[in-house]
Amino acid sequence: MEDAYARSVSEVLDFFGVDPTKGLSDSQVVHHSRLYGRNVLPEEKRTPFWKLVLKQFDDLLVKILIVAAIVSFVLALANGETGLTAFLEPFVILLILAANAAVGVITETNAEKALEELRAYQANIATVLRNGCFSILPATELVPGDIVEVTVGCKIPADLRMIEMSSNTFRVDQAILTGESCSVEKDVDCTLTTNAVYQDKKNILFSGTDVVAGRGRAVVIGVGSNTAMGSIHDSMLQTDDEATPLKKKLDEFGSFLAKVIAGICVLVWVVNIGHFSDPSHGGFFKGAIHYFKIAVALAVAAIPEGLPAVVTTCLALGTKKMARLNAIVRSLPSVETLGCTTVICSDKTGTLTTNMMSVSKICVVQSAEHGPMINEFTVSGTTYAPEGTVFDSNGMQLDLPAQSPCLHHLAMCSSLCNDSILQYNPDKDSYEKIGESTEVALRVLAEKVGLPGFDSMPSALNMLSKHERASYCNHYWENQFKKVYVLEFTRDRKMMSVLCSHKQMDVMFSKGAPESIIARCNKILCNGDGSVVPLTAAGRAELESRFYSFGDETLRCLALAFKTVPHGQQTISYDNENDLTFIGLVGMLDPPREEVRDAMLACMTAGIRVIVVTGDNKSTAESLCRKIGAFDNLVDFSGMSYTASEFERLPAVQQTLALRRMTLFSRVEPSHKRMLVEALQKQNEVVAMTGDGVNDAPALKKADIGIAMGSGTAVAKSASDMVLADDNFASIVAAVAEGRAIYNNTKQFIRYMISSNIGEVVCIFVAAVLGIPDTLAPVQLLWVNLVTDGLPATAIGFNKQDSDVMKAKPRKVGEAVVTGWLFFRYLVIGVYVGLATVAGFIWWFVYSDGGPKLTYSELMNFETCALRETTYPCSIFEDRHPSTVAMTVLVVVEMFNALNNLSENQSLLVITPRSNLWLVGSIILTMLLHVLILYVHPLAVLFSVTPLSWAEWTAVLYLSFPVIIIDELLKFLSRNTGMRFRFRLRKADLLPKDRRDK
């Protein structure tokens, strides 16, 4: 029943055909169960394991590698090759792909926990009226039409419509659903508001929320998916994970690379058609097969097999850095997404604020001799911890606040006129509330004021354990005074009173709305000397002025008073709530976190816009935004603050314009948060969404990066990409800075691997065009790509963060990983790497003292060796020395190139290798591994290599070192943009323009 909130009680009961005094009959229960379904959230249909596995191979580069492995395997069989080396290449490729698939399957298997944990917010049992009798049943057996009894402390088992109240007031904490910082009062009256949001439905109790005060009965109007919690569940089912910017760019690069690889492979094969019939191949067909193998080797060389593993490893290392900043990353790709975040949609309650109501101001009458002289105190501390101090109007700390008469009586009244509990939770190492937030705030105030008559009170309190300290002062007052009778809060009186007995004196303490309390007072307690004087009209007007000023600061204001009553009185009535003595006013709020203002400023400096999203009313939220600097100190912020209903009423064009300026979005429901994220994403914004409640989960999952609070619900955490362990909004800023640094390092090692692969492609291509023997075997290329490239590339991820990383604007989502000028730079480096490798191969044949010292012509016509008379054996072309020299040149030149990647533009003389000792260590380890395969015989056989002489190592160094000089020249040109010889590829990147300029 969707409009139950707008129907009267009798209409709702008639709709379900239920008698409120008897409940449903057994036959009605069976009928309603068939009609409406069970009160459970349906489980999402799980993806079969085999589909998850196949999904991991749905990538163009992966498919190319699979084809390369299959072709390599078939060719080995066709040529009759045997032994481990014949099948090593396809085996290694498939092993890599299997490992990547395993990681992907594990990640996706863990991604569905949010939906399971949402069920934790469903109540387990319910007190239900059926067949005229109350019974306790599992909540899953509830059906629409059931009459349910609800009382303080119970969790609402389904969506209910209030039909009867057994107490003067009934309040529910529905923060997990709406984000409201205070509990909400409920009643049985129908709501006539059109397009009512959850906050407007004052007669509806939502599934999963908690009753904090009162007792009543309600009728079930929605179960399972047809509840507010169920709609959140459905939203999460409908949310697909978006690819991160880096994933998108790597996918684009993979597509581009695949096309280039295919083109080069075909070109190499076509260029060598004339060599198919060379006698050395044994026929045209076998020649075609030979050059097809070269094309396959080229594909293996061109594809950076280690790139997925290196990206994953670098992001994983980044998560460890972020964990030290209290940002726990649940989704690896979200690490780099932080770097291009342009908008943070921040939940207000519990994220920007502490979600702990606390008293921040106290107003008392100091004296009344010449008219009322008001004195204001401020109170520090923004949590439920009984830690904080009281300051006078001059900012001076009060050492013993309880010695002030008014503060002394405020503490008594706050403690005794109170039904809440403040306790310490050792498991969470935090103080927690049971009951109303406002009442707990008064309990905490009583602890901060302390007790009178003890000069050593502050130090004595500090010596207590946290468990004892939680309510030490409150317990003192409760032991001094015995509660005799309580007049509960009602909406018409707007106050609560409690009768207490103390030795030979009975006192009635009252608290409530200032206008109600002040109207019932005729005397004032003066803080100066503790005297009680009459309350004059001038004094009344001054007090009213003060509580209105508290309201302007959006403080929730309460007034406290007391009255001495005849000793032995056992009850009090509403008639006794007159002739009260005014004690003071307290102003409380859900305070902003102390570090939020600086964090907001840092976000603005970094070009990141913050939109505050809350279920609270507009004026309260606007006040918070002013305090944290979200409005950038503007007096007029029209066009920057909207309620959900105001925004929805705007035409589409104005909504688009409003999104560009919006800073505050108030009175929202979960669907509005998700809608906001989607609308911003349509404007090409990269959106981070923070939150801690169940109500935030759909938006957290939809956002480019969802950020949950560490103290938030399990649902929010599981739907998020990152969790802030310390609930500190400021940690987001540190995480963004680290995310930007990680992305910069990711670009560096991607460029490093690309330039290395370009070198390998150039090597094979040049060798094929020149017609010389195979320079490198496929297994050698795999070794270089996976081991000798992978280790330094991973270490590049440890490059230090730039000092100005948070002064730059967010990078554009469409920014290419490799832009025009940079592609040119790494193309130059890659070409040199390839030519140096080929040069090393040729050097051994032509110039090395250990080689045959052939002429260029003899080397390029090696296929005809058997047909001519030579001074050297034809078996020389199968010698492992030249390919070993070439492979070693490739490895060493790439180690020098790794040093080039310490910085994109800074010289090695400025940013020295000492700045990243991990990289130095990885280079040393790589060289040790390379030496290992050269000088350990079984490994040398496996990789078709042989030990090198000192002269050969010297040649390797001569051919490798110039890569440092070349890159230093290119860096110099980058730093001096006017000296690039007008080389401009930024507007015409080698990647498709429509992909780069989105």
From Swiss-Prot:
UniProt organism field: Arabidopsis thaliana (Mouse-ear cress)
Protein's UniProt name: Calcium-transporting ATPase 3, endoplasmic reticulum-type
Lineage: Eukaryota, Viridiplantae, Streptophyta, Embryophyta, Tracheophyta
Residues binding Ca(2+) 1: 757, 760, 788-789, 894
Lumenal topological domain residue ranges: 70-89, 271-291, 767-776, 841-883, 936-950
Keywords of the record: ATP-binding, Calcium, Calcium transport, Endosome, Golgi apparatus, Ion transport, Magnesium, Membrane, Metal-binding, Nucleotide-binding, Translocase, Transmembrane, Transmembrane helix, Transport
Family per record: Belongs to the cation transport ATPase (P-type) (TC 3.A.3) family. Type IIA subfamily.
Superkingdom as given in the UniProt entry: Eukaryota
Coiled-coil segments on the chain, per record: none
Tagged with keyword Transport: yes
EC number: 7.2.2.10
Active site: 347
Further facts: ECA3 is functionally distinct from ECA1 and is localized to a separate compartment.
Binding annotation for Mg(2+): 692, 696
Primary subcellular site in the record, as a coarse category: Golgi
One example of a Gene Ontology biological process annotation: root development
Record-annotated membrane-spanning stretches: 49-69, 90-109, 251-270, 292-309, 747-766, 777-797, 818-840, 884-903, 917-935, 951-971
Membrane topology type: Multi-pass membrane protein
Biological role: This magnesium-dependent enzyme catalyzes the hydrolysis of ATP coupled with the translocation of calcium from the cytosol to an endomembrane compartment. Involved in calcium-enhanced root growth, in tolerance to toxic levels of manganese and in secretory processes. Has a crucial role in manganese nutrition, but is not involved in transporting copper, iron or zinc.
Binding site for Ca(2+) 2: 300-301, 303, 305, 785, 789
UniProt tissue specificity: Expressed in root cap, in elongation and differentiation zones of roots, in vascular tissues of roots, leaves, floral pedicels and style, in leaves, including hydathodes and guard cells, in stamens, in petals, in sepals and in siliques.
Subcellular location field: Golgi apparatus membrane; Endosome membrane; Prevacuolar compartment membrane
NCBIfam families according to UniProt: ATPase-IIA1_Ca (TIGR01116), ATPase_P-type (TIGR01494)
Top enzyme class: translocase
One MF annotation (Gene Ontology) recorded for this entry: ABC-type manganese transporter activity
Stretches assigned to the Cytoplasmic side: 1-48, 110-250, 310-746, 798-817, 904-916, 972-998
Induction entry: Not induced by manganese or zinc.
